[in-house]
Design a protein with these regions (language model features):
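Cytoplasmic helix-loop-helix junction between adjacent transmembrane helices
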Residues: 157-197
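Glycine-rich segments within core transmembrane alpha-helices of 12-TM secondary carriers
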Residues: 186-214, 237, 418-428
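Helix-to-loop junctions at the C-terminal end of transmembrane segments
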Residues: 112-126, 335-348, 436
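Symmetry-related core transmembrane helices of the 12-TM Major Facilitator Superfamily/SLC fold
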Residues: 227-246, 443-461
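C-terminal transmembrane helical hairpin of 12-TM major facilitator-type secondary transporters
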Residues: 347-397
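Conserved MFS/SLC helix-loop-helix module at the cytosolic interface between two early adjacent transmembrane helices
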Residues: 112-153
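Extracytoplasmic gate region of multi-pass secondary transporters
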Residues: 73-74, 282-334, 394, 428
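Cytosolic juxtamembrane N-terminal segment immediately preceding the first transmembrane helix
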Residues: 2-68, 73
């Protein structure tokens, strides 16, 4: 607790002495961006603005478009392999793994670039990162338009790499947007909405490509279908970039919560490298980084390899593979929102994290052993349960990290969580692809189930150290003390004024 008090004392307004030597709070002249606490006459101004819903909606839309570009090629991996076969390796494993890299490049690009992008987020703020992400997202989409030829897989990979760089400026923003724009009882819900946009994009990426680009023996027909898909995507993402330029703002005129006001001051005072060091010294956050990476990495591996997993049991069902992916994501959207609302009401971060992790593992086991039944409706049901809990874990992990690492920047902690997810996503995708080719799909699914079991066990060792909640309680206590002092002083002053009058009346 002493650590939290020291952090608060550095970021609270200065104390001065008022009448009768009592301490009163005065304005901190060095507070940035006009968010200085003014407690000499009243409480600090905190306010939520209606614009916050426009900001989070716009973020959801362009996050959705980037997530769509992540998976829209791999859900039709067999068709992409057929069309670009002339520019792919001859060896089967290398050829399939090369196509898998259209998804894994998102994971690979994130790992080395997360640190400079997080530094940019902390130094330049939300608007700069939003502009960078939206611009690169649109640029990558237009580059794909130039890839319509069987010998241009290298250009397609380059375009996908540009989109992968764009997501670096997107994935770390939900918790930051929630903290900067939303009130204390809306933070978890807002974070869930931020993740919601990303998941809707994945859902569209699963559903639409198998419909727009059906399997065909004619390469010309496949090329025409790909062209329609790429042009439509490029136009939509260009519109979003223009909207971000016009609408997206850095922060509201006043902070939405007292905790955010204090956190903002600390971000300006603390060095980014020192913030990273503080996070790495936090054992609970270290464990959470690994377990979050494992859970989300499993989700990435399943999403990337869903096409071969489903086609192994249901040949020729490309559209069913996309619909199963859609089911996973839609159920996950419900899970994300439900988890956010649950956290806002209960604040039971560790218990919720552990419970969802265990249920994710149970859902994966059910999915694994129902594929053999050859009943698509059962597969859809189990996929929905898997998605509800596995995707519902994403915002819970962000918020748990923000709680146990306060007052460090939410952008930094969520960025490290995402970097871990990308790392484990690459390892698990390559490992599962090798298992599919050498052992079979069952072995691949068992590998993911076992990995989730290990992650569940490790999650139990994370301490429930809710620093953000404690900080909020302490600042409210200090404000109550200040208000009591001011009330006491006013009553004393009234008494001193009233005494001479009563004497005059007696005379």
């Amino acid at each position: 607790m002493a650590i939290f008090r020291n952090a608060l004392s550095r970021s609270l307004p200065e104390l001065d002495t008022g009448p009768q030597g009592q301490p009163i709070l005065v304005q901190n002249k060095e507070s940035p961006e006009g968010w200085a606490p003014k407690l000499t006459e009243s409480s600090p101004i905190t306010k939520v603005y209606k614009r916050r819903w426009i900001i989070v909606t716009l973020f959801c839309l362009y996050s959705m478009s980037n997530a769509y570009q992540w998976i829209h090629l791999n859900i039709i991996a067999n068709i992409i392999t057929k069309y670009y076969n002339a520019s792919l390796p001859e060896d089967r494993f290398q050829r399939e793994t090369t196509v898998d890299w259209l998804s894994m490049i998102y994971m690979l690009a994130y790992i080395p670039l997360i640190f400079p992008s997080t530094f940019l987020l902390n130094k330049k703020g939300l608007r700069v990162c939003a502009l960078a992400g939206a611009f690169l997202n649109a640029l990558g989409a237009w580059l794909k338009v130039a890839c319509i030829s069987p010998d241009r897989f290298a250009i397609l990979m380059f375009a996908q790499t540009v989109c992968a760089i764009a997501q670096i400026f997107i994935l770390g923003l939900p918790a930051k947007i929630a903290a900067v724009w939303f009130g204390p009882n809306e933070v978890s819900t807002a974070t869930s909405l931020g993740v919601f946009g990303n998941q809707v994009g994945v859902a569209i990426g699963f559903l639409v490509p198998p419909i727009l680009v059906p399997n065909s023996d004619s390469l010309d027909q496949i090329g025409d279908d790909l062209s329609i898909m790429f042009y439509a995507g490029a136009g939509y993402m260009t519109l979003l970039f223009i909207l971000v330029i016009i609408i997206f703002k850095e922060r509201p005129p006043h902070p939405p919560s007292k905790a955010q006001m204090l956190a903002l001051q600390n971000v300006h005072e603390e060095h980014y490298g020192r913030s990273l060091l503080n996070l790495f010294k936090n054992v609970g956050f270290d464990i959470l980084t690994i377990t979050y990476g494992v859970n989300t990495g499993c989700y990435y591996a399943i999403s990337t390899l869903l096409n071969p997993i489903i086609l192994d049991y249901f040949p020729g069902h490309e559209e069913s593979a996309g619909q199963i992916g859609l089911t996973i994501v839609i159920a996950g959207v419900g899970g994300s929102i439900a988890a956010g609302i649950w956290l806002d009401r209960t604040r039971t971060y560790k218990g919720t994290t552990l419970g969802i992790y265990f249920l994710s593992m149970a859902g994966m086991v059910a999915f694994t052993f129902t594929l053999d039944l050859s009943l698509l409706w059962v597969v859809f049901l189990c996929a929905g349960a898997l998605g509800f809990f596995m995707t519902g874990y994403l915002p819970v992990g962000f918020e748990f990290a923000a709680e146990i690492t306060y007052p460090e920047s939410e952008g930094t902690s969520s960025g490290l969580l995402n970097a871990s997810a990308q790392f484990f996503g690459i390892i698990l995708t390559i490992g599962c692809r090798a298992m599919i080719n050498k052992v079979g799909t069952l072995g691949s699914n068992i590998l993911i189930s076992g990995t989730l079991l290990l992650g569940t066990i490790c999650t139990g060792f994370i301490a429930a150290d809710y620093r953000r909640q404690e900080a909020g309680k302490e600042i409210l206590d200090q404000m109550d003390n200040v208000m009591q002092i001011e009330i006491s002083e006013k009553e004393s002053e009234k008494s001193r004024i009233a005494e001479p009058r009563s004497r005059d009346n007696q005379i």
